[in-house]
Every structure is written in C-alpha cells, then in structure tokens.
C-alpha cells in the first residue's frame, strides 16, 4: 500500500483533478514527478519537495484528467505518450504509466509564435469545446503551460476555467491574477486563481531576488544589476521572437526589484541600471538553463562591492517543484470557497503575484493558509 494512504484526502477518496494546457517539458516534469513521489512518506523530509502533504493532499492525490495541445505529434495520443513526443527533451525522472487520458486539440489563438511554427506541425484536427471537455473530465484545476507571449490564448483558457467552474494556475507571464479586472472575474465566479508566472524552486529569479535583498539588509546599496539567461528548450527558442518577450522581461524584473526599498533600482522595471531577461537560445543545452547574474553595489565608505554567479539548472523539473504545490493550493482554495487570487500562494510561488511580499513573509502566510488561515 502506498504511504500516502494516511492523507486526509486519500482516506476520503478525494483527489486533485488537473487539466494541463500545453504538454511540453514543464508538463512532462510535473507528471513524471507525480509518479516519482507517489509513495513518499507523508511525515518525511523529501528532497525536491517543499510539502509532501499540502493541507489534505499528498502528491499522489494529484491526478491528470485532461490535456490540451496544438502539436500534431501530441494531439490524439495518451498524455503519457504525448509527453515524450514532439520537441520535449527534459531529463527523465520516472516512467509514466498509461493514463487513459487523450490529448485534445485546443484552439491555437496566438499560442504559436514564429519559431514554434517552424519547429512543429500544427494539428489539422478541429479544436474541441474546451469548457465541455473540462466538465466531462471533472477537472478541479486548470494549469496553463502555454508558451511565453500567448496573451490571447492564456486569457481564453482562463475564461474556460471560469465557465467550467475550475480553479486556474497561471504558470506563464501573462498578467491575469495580477490584473484587477481578471481578478474580479474570478471573484465574481467564486473561483480561485494562482498566478502569475511560476517562480522556479531555486532559479535565477529567486536567487537574484534574495541576494539583492541581502545587499540592502547588510547596508550595501545596490547600484546596478543584470541577469542573462540562455537555454536550449522550446521556451528559449520561442523567446528569440522578441515581440513575445515584453511581459516576460517585466515579470522577471519586477520580481527582483520589488523586493528592494532603498537602492536606486528599487521598484524599477525600465531602467538602464537593471537588465533582467532571457538572452539567447543554445540548442545543445536542451532543457538546461544557464543564468549569469551580476550585482554591483556600494559598501562601507562607498567602496565598490560586486558579486557574480552562474546558476545551472534543468529548467522544467525546477518549475515542477513549485507547480506541484500550486495545484494543491488551488484545490484547497476551491474546497474552501476562496474566490479570486490566492494571495499567499501567489506571493510565494509566482514571480508576478497581485501583491509582492518579502519571501519570508510570503512563506509564513503560505503555511498559515495551508493550516486553514489566511488566503
């Protein structure tokens, strides 16, 4: 018997039914992770997980019930097969069993940029009625993994989540949870949303954010900073199309500078002394990402103090370690009748939440939320 049998949800036969929009590398790592950690002991400290049991829900209580894509090499396949098709190339952590869930053809809208169109064949199958499919699958939470720049497509799926009575987890930098108009739509519908733009487990954003804040805490003025990122997956190839990058650059930049108070770059997004964003595509890196970060400050006696570091990660597992909590937070919020942005989860797990909080405060609030406190 699996160790998760002691989770409150498992004892009552409750699950977190998720629908995944975009069956790419990130989705692959998430679904493989569900298999990898399904037998994790609830009371153990498990490498790679912040919470083996999140509220009532163990990792094993998360079930994939629907999937949507536009890639001809994925549509019509079982999710388990589709996740190892097309341009997917992330590191493998577990074998995914046959799930009995067919990938449906979703509407494209603006989801395929120029480089995607050059790399994949768009499915000729007629798009399905997404709302009807979500209801049929009895989905609780819709997870949007659409490519960067999919503004219209992401909003379409957010509306579908509302119409189907689902919570929504917005993993990409399209501003929905942080948009007052969209936040109100979810409040009016009585449904929760967590967003925007997933903050990886230990990625360039969280390390840069923490170190920038450390400069200020230790009395060093942060005068200028930069973060350059290169990777070899379809996300980075897609971002070669600079027109699709604007929201991504804003999201990554404000995630760092919003955590500052007194430095010249505090709160800045468009400033010559702050440069943060994706930089280039290097195909042989595959799903790895390399980040080069530099912080320049003024310390005691106005003496220069500079810090440089390089971070190497597998991009998709790094995000899955956060999404695995986000979907359970969304389900808890749904169970409790929380409407609108789930502030605690959004602030700790996302780059561009409705409210930016210091990470220690956000973490404390998230734990309070898990235990039944604030939303």
Regions found by a protein language model. Give the residues of each.
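NAD(P)-dependent Rossmann-like dehydrogenase/reductase catalytic/cofactor-binding core
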Residues: 317-375
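Rossmann-fold NAD(P)-binding glycine/threonine-rich loop
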Residues: 147-163, 171-192
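Short gly/pro/ser/thr-enriched loop/turn and capping motifs at secondary-structure boundaries
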Residues: 28, 175-179, 199-204, 231-233
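Rossmann-fold dehydrogenase core element
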Residues: 185-198, 219, 223
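N-terminal glycine-/serine-/threonine-rich beta1-alpha1-beta2 phosphate-ribose binding loop
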Residues: 2-157, 245-250, 291, 300
């Amino acid at each position: 018997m699996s160790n998760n049998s002691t989770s409150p949800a498992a004892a009552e036969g409750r699950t977190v039914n998720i629908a995944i929009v975009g069956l790419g590398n990130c989705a692959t790592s998430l679904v493989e992770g569900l298999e990898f950690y399904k037998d994790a002991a609830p009371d153990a400290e498990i490498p790679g997980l912040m919470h083996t049991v999140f509220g009532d829900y163990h990792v094993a209580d998360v079930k994939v019930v629907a999937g949507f894509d536009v890639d001809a090499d994925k549509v019509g396949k079982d999710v388990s097969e589709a996740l190892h098709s097309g341009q997917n190339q992330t590191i493998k952590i577990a074998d995914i069993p046959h799930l009995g869930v067919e990938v449906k053809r979703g509407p494209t809208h603006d989801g395929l940029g120029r480089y995607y169109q050059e790399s994949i064949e768009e499915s000729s199958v007629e798009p399905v009625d997404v709302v009807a499919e979500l209801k049929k699958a009895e989905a609780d939470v819709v997870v949007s993994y659409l490519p960067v720049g999919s503004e219209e497509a992401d909003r379409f799926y957010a509306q579908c989540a509302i119409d189907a009575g689902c919570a929504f987890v917005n993993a990409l930098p399209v501003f929905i949870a942080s948009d007052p108009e969209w936040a109100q739509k979810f409040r009016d519908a009585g449904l929760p949303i967590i967003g925007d733009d997933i903050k990886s487990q230990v990625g360039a954003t969280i390390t840069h954010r923490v170190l920038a804040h450390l400069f200020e805490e230790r009395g060093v003025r942060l005068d200028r900073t930069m973060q350059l990122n290169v990777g070899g997956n379809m996300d980075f190839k897609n971002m070669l199309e600079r027109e699709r990058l604007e929201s991504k650059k804003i999201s990554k930049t404000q995630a760092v500078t919003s955590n500052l108070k007194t430095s010249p770059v505090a709160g800045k997004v468009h400033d010559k002394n702050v440069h943060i964003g994706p930089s280039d595509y290097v195909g042989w890196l595959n799903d790895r990402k390399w980040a080069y970060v530099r912080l320049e400050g003024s310390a005691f006696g106005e003496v220069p103090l500079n810090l440089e570091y390089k971070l190497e990660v597998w991009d998709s597992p790094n995000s899955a370690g956060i999404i695995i909590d986000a979907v359970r937070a969304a389900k808890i919020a749904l169970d409790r009748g929380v409407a609108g942005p789930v502030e605690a989860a959004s602030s700790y797990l996302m780059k561009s939440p409705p409210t930016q909080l210091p990470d220690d405060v956000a973490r404390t609030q998230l734990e309070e939320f898990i235990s039944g406190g604030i939303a």
